[in-house]
């Protein structure tokens, strides 16, 4: 049996795709990898350019994506298996066998479509919002809201950022006042991914005093009176459905409160570990997409009487991208192994990984930035054109910045990683 899988372009695939000496992956991982790649290449990749031009992914595509098990895979199959009913996971992996490395494979292989907008449309809201519902929702809430998501009949988004509040979550101003059996919500959430087509928004709202101790999380239906949405025209990710959502005296049943009242800030902080690991996986696969396209271009493009690939300068650029991808992915795999060994549920925090998740996201985003820049340098005008061999690199050059900023900016996460790691090391030192 051959262990080789995928591209022969150097550094275009994770090392375990071509090397059998790897203890982290087994036959179910290889089966999943093959299943996801076949699906993405046949049903998603050929249509990304059209969907980005249209500014949306067709609803029947999103529903089929969920029906094939990808919504459940993004949330945490072992935690939602009782809500899956007839839905089977990609690669036919049993929910009880699903681990963190299966999740990494899905995040990696779906991103190979080469369009961040399409990638986000297929499941960003599910990936970042639904783990909160799984980890903090009541059994009644999970039974009501999870089955439609898993079957592709409804979609979620996460509303945190506001027009005047970005990284400073503790000072958000969207307010929810309790009146009897309802919360009355007023305020605006901005840059909400999937906000144009989501059915529900898990929103951070102020229910108490100023600061982090006065924030709660509400699951707000988006088809009720007082909710208005406006699509935000961004540099990239056109099909991702980025929106501004305004709440004007919106009535939300008190039973839609997730977790404890005024504990929402801490719930959000715990959810970011999974969120940032997912972003890191996306960044590194998209960096590989750039590398692969630049390498293939360099094989055929002639300059000064020989192919680009025969110029040492070009090979050095490709090597630099490969160095960053390989080292960053090794960090991501180590973090994934740590999460697995600690039996961390997706979306929950565990002592010792918050700072590592932050710095892994920073490293992956920097790698993606480098890959975009150097691939454009190699491909020249072809990678500045929305048609031809450089169209994916051109598109990703517009998509890339949102992954550097979103999910925590490089500056915020770098500073946080030092502070958090110092706390964790001091805690570890005092452990028996």
Curated annotation (Swiss-Prot):
- InterPro entries tied to this protein: Acyl-CoA_dehydrogenase (IPR050741), Acyl-CoA_Oxase/DH_mid-dom (IPR006091), Acyl-CoA_Oxase/DH_mid-dom_sf (IPR046373), AcylCo_DH-like_C (IPR036250), AcylCo_DH/oxidase_C (IPR009075), AcylCoA_DH/ox_N (IPR013786), AcylCoA_DH/ox_N_sf (IPR037069), AcylCoA_DH/oxidase_NM_dom_sf (IPR009100)
A single GO cellular-component term from the record reads: cytoplasm
EC identifiers of the protein: 1.-.-.-
Gene3D superfamilies in the cross-refs: Acyl-CoA dehydrogenase/oxidase, N-terminal domain, Butyryl-CoA Dehydrogenase, subunit A, domain 2, Butyryl-CoA Dehydrogenase, subunit A, domain 3
User: Sorted alphabetically, which keywords does the UniProt record give?
Assistant: FAD, Flavoprotein, Oxidoreductase, Virulence
Q: In which pathway does it act?
A: Mycotoxin biosynthesis
Q: What happens when the gene is disrupted?
A: Reduces the production of AF-toxin and pathogenicity.
Question: Which enzyme class?
Answer: oxidoreductase
Q: Which cofactor does it need?
A: FAD
* A Gene Ontology biological process term: fatty acid beta-oxidation using acyl-CoA dehydrogenase
Q: What GO molecular function annotation could you give as one example from this UniProt entry?
A: acyl-CoA dehydrogenase activity
Other information: Gene clusters encoding host-selective toxins (HSTs) are localized on conditionally dispensable chromosomes (CDCs), also called supernumerary chromosomes, where they are present in multiple copies. The CDCs are not essential for saprophytic growth but controls host-selective pathogenicity.
Task: Please give the function described in this protein's UniProt entry.
Answer: Acyl-CoA dehydrogenase; part of the gene clusters that mediate the biosynthesis of the host-selective toxins (HSTs) AF-toxins responsible for Alternaria black spot of strawberry disease by the strawberry pathotype. AF-toxin I and III are valine derivatives of 2,3-dyhydroxy-isovaleric acid and 2-hydroxy-isovaleric acid respectively, while AF II is an isoleucine derivative of 2-hydroxy-valeric acid. These derivatives are bound to a 9,10-epoxy-8-hydroxy-9-methyl-decatrienoic acid (EDA) moiety.
Similarity comment: family membership: Belongs to the acyl-CoA dehydrogenase family.
Q: What is this protein called?
A: Acyl-CoA dehydrogenase AFT10-1
The opening ranks of the lineage are:
Eukaryota, Fungi, Dikarya, Ascomycota, Pezizomycotina
Gene name linked to the record: AFT10-1
């Amino acid at each position: 049996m051959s262990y080789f899988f995928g591209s022969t372009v150097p550094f275009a695939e994770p090392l375990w795709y071509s090397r059998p000496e790897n203890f982290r992956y087994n036959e179910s991982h290889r089966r999943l990898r093959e299943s996801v790649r076949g699906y993405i290449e046949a049903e998603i990749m050929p249509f990304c350019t059209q969907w980005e031009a249209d500014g949306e992914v067709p609803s029947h595509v999103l529903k089929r994506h969920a029906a094939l098990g990808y919504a459940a895979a993004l949330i945490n199959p072992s935690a939602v298996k009782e809500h899956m009913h007839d839905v089977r996971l990609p690669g036919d992996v049993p929910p009880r066998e699903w681990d963190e490395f299966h999740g990494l494979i899905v995040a990696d292989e779906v991103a190979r479509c080469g369009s961040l907008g399409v990638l986000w449309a297929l499941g960003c809201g599910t990936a970042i919002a639904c783990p909160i519902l799984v980890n903090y929702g009541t059994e009644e809430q999970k039974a009501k809201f999870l089955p439609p998501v898993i079957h592709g009949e409804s979609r979620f988004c996460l509303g945190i950022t506001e027009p005047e509040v970005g990284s400073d979550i503790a000072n958000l101003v969207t307010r929810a006042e309790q009146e009897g059996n309802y919360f009355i919500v007023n305020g605006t959430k901005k840059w909400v991914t999937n906000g144009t087509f989501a059915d529900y928004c898990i929103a951070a709202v102020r229910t108490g005093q100023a600061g982090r101790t006065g924030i709660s999380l509400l699951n707000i239906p988006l088809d009720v009176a007082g909710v208005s949405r406006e699509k935000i025209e961004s540099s990239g990710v056109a099909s991702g459905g980025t929106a501004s959502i305004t709440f004007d005296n919106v009535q939300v049943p008190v039973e839609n409160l997730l977790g404890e009242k005024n504990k929402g800030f801490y719930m959000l902080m715990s959810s970011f570990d999974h969120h940032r690991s997912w972003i890191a996986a996306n960044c590194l696969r998209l960096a590989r997409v750039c590398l692969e396209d630049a390498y293939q271009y360099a094989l055929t493009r002639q300059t000064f009487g020989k192919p680009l690939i025969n110029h040492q300068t070009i090979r050095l650029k490709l090597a630099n991208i490969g160095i960053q991808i390989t080292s960053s992915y090794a960090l991501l795999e180590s973090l994934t192994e740590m999460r697995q060994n600690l039996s961390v549920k997706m979306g929950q925090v565990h002592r010792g990984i918050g700072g590592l998740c932050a710095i892994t996201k920073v490293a992956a985003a920097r790698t993606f930035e480098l890959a975009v820049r150097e691939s454009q340098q190699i491909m020249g005008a072809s990678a500045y054109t929305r048609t031809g061999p450089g169209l994916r690199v051109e598109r990703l050059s517009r998509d890339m910045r949102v992954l550097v900023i979103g999910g925590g900016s490089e500056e915020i996460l770098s500073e946080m990683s030092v502070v958090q790691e110092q706390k964790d090391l001091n805690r570890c030192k005092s452990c028996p």
